[in-house]
Regions:
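C-terminal motif of bacterial Sec signal peptides marking the signal peptidase cleavage site
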Residues: 15-18
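Bacterial signal peptide processing site
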Residues: 20-23
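Short beta-strand elements that form the blades of beta-propeller/WD-repeat-like
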Residues: 72-76, 86, 140-149
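Surface-exposed, charged secondary-structure patches
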Residues: 132-134, 229-273
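Short, low-complexity N-terminal intrinsically disordered segments enriched in polar/charged residues
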Residues: 179-202
Length: 320
């Protein structure tokens, strides 16, 4: 029960899925990492009429309508004709419709994303797709957290989508618990940080302000300043050589070791070599469970915490 409660709490805080109400608030390799979208032709953004009676569904759709800087963002869940019953309750398999403008020009118009596009080979019938109630926005990208869950359980997959100003949609699979099964907020944060940071570093034209914004969100002031000048090549957080976004498919966050404020991350590069890094964590002031990144050290496989069970799996592909 404790594990279930903690998992649901973490997912609710970050993703706000199965319990969401009808609210407004402020995705290469074996499979394609980008979602192929169906795009409706619209000269300007106009709210589409939706005659669906959502009161018959136990989970109400979430929507985001907000303006951040020169971004205008409209993302909503909608009923796309698929539903199922669980006991006496009716669940809708919601899809997403995305309309995003930047500088008054459309970047995504009528961009539709469904559960199969997000989950790929991890698609499971009668799991429901849910989105967070807010986005994180930089000069280059709009970031959206998603969950894909078995209704009324703690069995979930989590993802982060990056809607880029160049029209690309990238996807990274994240997790609500460490590889060893530790459920804590730092796991979400480390996954999300690496997804956002690598996305910013690997933009066609990396934007310094956008990179700094991600660093400031997840790192101490001193470490953020130290990392500002680094690129995707020979980066202390990533390792030697040039890091490619698709390598995040094998990205793993391990548990913090007892008595320490650090965790090991690792990923695999082409050829099978694994790279290990120890991420140093520091508690946020006046919080008990929230951590930010304060440094990074090289690590080895011998330093990994002991495994309780499970087998390592690669994350899904990263473009949609």
């Amino acid at each position: 029960m404790k594990k279930l409660a903690l998992t649901l709490s973490l997912i609710a805080i970050t993703l706000l899925t199965a319990c969401s109400g009808n609210k407004k608030a402020d995705t290469n390799g074996a499979e394609n990492d980008s979602i192929t979208a169906k795009t409706d032709s619209m000269p300007l953004y106009v709210e589409e009429e939706d005659k669906t009676d959502y009161s018959k569904f136990v989970v109400q759709p979430t929507r985001i309508d907000t303006t951040v800087g020169d971004w205008e963002i409209h993302i909503r869940e909608f009923y796309d004709g698929k539903k199922f019953k669980l006991g006496n309750q009716v669940f809708a398999n919601y899809s997403l419709k995305v309309n995003i403008f930047k500088g008054g020009k459309p970047v995504f118009k009528g961009h539709k994303i469904d559960a199969k596009a997000v989950a790929g080979s991890n698609y499971i019938k009668d799991f429901i797709l849910g989105m967070s109630e807010n986005v994180f926005v930089t000069e280059t990208t709009v970031y959206l957290n998603l969950s894909y869950c078995e209704p009324e359980t703690d069995y979930c997959q989590t993802y982060i989508l990056a809607f880029c100003a160049n029209g690309q949609v990238r996807k990274a699979q994240t997790a609500s618990e460490s590889y060893e099964g530790d459920m804590d907020g730092y796991v979400f944060d480390v996954y999300d940080f690496y997804a956002m940071y690598v996305n910013e570093l690997t933009q066609p034209q990396p934007n310094k302000a956008a990179i700094q914004k991600v660093l400031n969100k997840y790192c101490t002031k001193g470490f953020a300043q130290k990392m500002q000048s680094h690129t995707s090549n020979n980066n202390p957080l990533l390792g030697s050589g040039k890091f490619e976004f698709q390598w995040l498919r094998s990205f793993i966050v391990h548990s913090k070791e007892a008595g320490t404020n650090s965790c090991i991350i690792h990923y695999q590069i082409p050829g099978g070599k694994k790279v290990y890094k120890r991420v140093l964590l520091q508690k946020k002031p006046r919080t008990e469970y929230d951590f930010i990144i304060s440094g990074v050290l090289d690590a080895t496989e011998d330093e990994l915490p002991s495994m309780s069970d499970g087998e390592e799996e690669d994350a899904e592909d990263d473009e949609m």
